[in-house]
Amino acid sequence: MTVVCWSSRLLLLLPYLLLCVFGPSASHAGRLLVFPMDGSHWLSMLGVIQQLQQKGHEVVVIAPEASIHIKEGSFYTLRKFPVPFQKENVTATLVELGRTAFNQDSFLLRVVKIYMKVKRDSSMLLAGCSHLLHNAEFMASLEESHFDALLTDPFLPCGSIVAQYLTVPTVYFLNKLPCSLDSEATQCPVPLSYVPKSLSFNSDRMNFLQRVKNVLLAVSENFMCRVVYSPYGSLATEILQKEVTVQDLLSPASIWLMRSDFVKDYPRPIMPNMVFIGGINCLQKKPLSQEFEAYVNASGEHGIVVFSLGSMVSEIPEKKAMEIAEALGRIPQTVLWRYTGTRPSNLAKNTILVKWLPQNDLLGHPKTRAFITHSGSHGIYEGICNGVPMVMMPLFGDQMDNAKRMETRGAGVTLNVLEMTADDLENALKTVINNKSYKENIMRLSSLHKDRPIEPLDLAVFWVEYVMRHKGAPHLRPAAHDLTWYQYHSLDVIGFLLAIVLTVVFIVFKCCAYGCRKCFGGKGRVKKSHKSKTH
């Protein structure tokens, strides 16, 4: 009886077993083309690529031969294309950018120098993009590969041109774009009354003068963006054989994976194809190496301070480095300072210089008391994920805005790296370490950030696969993309209704005037004629 019973059960299970063995896999293996941007942008994308490869997808990465960080990997195929510049040129550009942050020229001279540098650097990158797109053999090989989707960082829209040339759906992986290009390309509303512009140093609670400043910045910001991005429109027009603007390049993206969230950023409108994956770089913490474990253990009850200004800053002017070293020597904590420049002569015993440090792993250690950072988005999120209060020294780009957001939330103190003194840095460190409110605020942000139904990495992987499976996501694209500017703002409707109202008012006015003439004009003429007869 028992044997018969088990046989019956096996017969019932057999169809399901066959379905599992021979049926279609849950995740359709596809081919993904990746066109990343070098530097930290690439490093944050690596986790997504690795997960996709583990799910059976074939990943091909294309990059210039002059790339610094993009190298061969075990979970992707790297294909490099020639460009008209060398790796040394890219390195020199990054070093110069780091030095620019410590330039103490007058404001006007700094603006001119920054403008010239942006123009020079963007010309170099544009030349690399043009070299790729005119490489007929390389582009033909990409076309023959029949990719299911392209994953790229739209900060430089070369990947967008490649996607349109290959006619493949695109997934963007970014923090944000300058000049609100991301909002324009997604048709996302940006109310200037409570959404601060980049470099405005405003929060989302603005007074009248701050709102005036916000509007003026919105009007003027397109000048710099025209220098960087307009040439890509001309290049795309040549390659695609049709008139193309930068917005035309960016707007077809299926999904925008935004490396942000509303724990760091202020609440604002979003669109259906904008997916927030802030904190994706907060990977699983690893045990510290013996070297760093020894540093942490030797710090005693006071703990450690982690100090890094990012990979772009390799050297600091001697005077400023000595001011920083003096301030660090005044606190009881052990300071691990990632620095590759000349060793300051006044470096204290509690300060250890290292060429590299496992930043996320150190921030996750319970003995870490504070984090000195340049406020890059990666560092900010690692500070949030690990609940470490911050002393922020923003240098360029979106770092000023990141620092303002953390300061507004009471999670850190911001210093002007050009104007700060040793006393300022000492006081800032002692404030975030000894004032419990900073630790409480950053822990609250950390708790909010981690309270989510799905990890950012898994969410990013899901949406890339989604686009690969469905050949895009056109159902998430708003009809606003197909409207003219006057249709979008309903100016034609307003004009039509206004014309009707004015016409009705005009007709009513004419009718009233006619009625008045009939009622009062006739009597006046009769009386006048009667008087003339009596005389």
From Swiss-Prot:
Gene3D superfamilies per record: Glycogen Phosphorylase B
An example molecular function term from Gene Ontology annotations: steroid binding
Glycosites: N89, N297, N435
Enzyme class: transferase
Membrane-topology annotation of the record: Single-pass membrane protein
GO biological process: estrogen metabolic process; flavone metabolic process; xenobiotic metabolic process
EC number of the protein: 2.4.1.17
Signal peptide: 1-29
Database matches in CDD domains: GT1_Gtf-like
Tissue specificity: Highly expressed in liver and at lower levels in colon, kidney, stomach and intestine.
Induction, as annotated: By dioxin.
Keywords of this entry: Endoplasmic reticulum, Glycoprotein, Glycosyltransferase, Lipid metabolism, Membrane, Signal, Transferase, Transmembrane, Transmembrane helix
Transmembrane segments annotated in the record for this chain: 493-509
Record field: catalytic activity: glucuronate acceptor + UDP-alpha-D-glucuronate = acceptor beta-D-glucuronoside + UDP + H(+); 17beta-estradiol + UDP-alpha-D-glucuronate = 17beta-estradiol 3-O-(beta-D-glucuronate) + UDP + H(+); 2-hydroxyestrone + UDP-alpha-D-glucuronate = 2-hydroxyestrone 3-O-(beta-D-glucuronate) + UDP + H(+); 2-hydroxy-17beta-estradiol + UDP-alpha-D-glucuronate = 2-hydroxy-17beta-estradiol 3-O-(beta-D-glucuronate) + UDP + H(+)
Superkingdom in the source lineage: Eukaryota
Subcellular location: Endoplasmic reticulum membrane
SUPFAM superfamilies: UDP-Glycosyltransferase/glycogen phosphorylase
InterPro entries the record matches: UDP-glycosyltransferase, UDP_glucos_trans, UDP_glycos_trans_CS
Family: Belongs to the UDP-glycosyltransferase family.
Designated name of the protein: UDP-glucuronosyltransferase 1A1
Originating gene: Ugt1a1
